[in-house]
Amino acid sequence: MANNLKRLDSYLVPGKHIHLIGIGGVSMRPLGLVLRGMGITVTGSDMNASVSTDELIAKGIEVHIGHRAENIQGADCIIRTAAAHNDNPEVAAARAQGIPVFERAAATSGLSLWAAAVRMMQSAP
């Protein structure tokens, strides 16, 4: 995990703001939709507009085309695609501001554990 001080699961709660770098990607788009469905404020950025980014915008997710430091304003944490390296302006700005940056793989793993816990709680007597 990119940030050992704070665990991602502490951000997977309604009312938090998570910014996704590369939100138009094949694994990031559904992640954004799931997070929004959980009551989390989701914003994101991608290098290019696409059918995926248009769908996210239509569903109420703020999408920025291009990567700029100001895109992360107000975010509690960042989830980045593997294609967004440390020199990405949003990653660099988050680190400079002390905003935790997590890898997409950690986010999907965290959500899988969260979903399993919910299922277990629902099936408990």
Segments (PLM) and residue ranges:
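N-terminal leader/targeting and accessory segments in enzymes
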Residues: M1-R104
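Walker A (P-loop) phosphate-binding motif
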Residues: L20, A105-P125
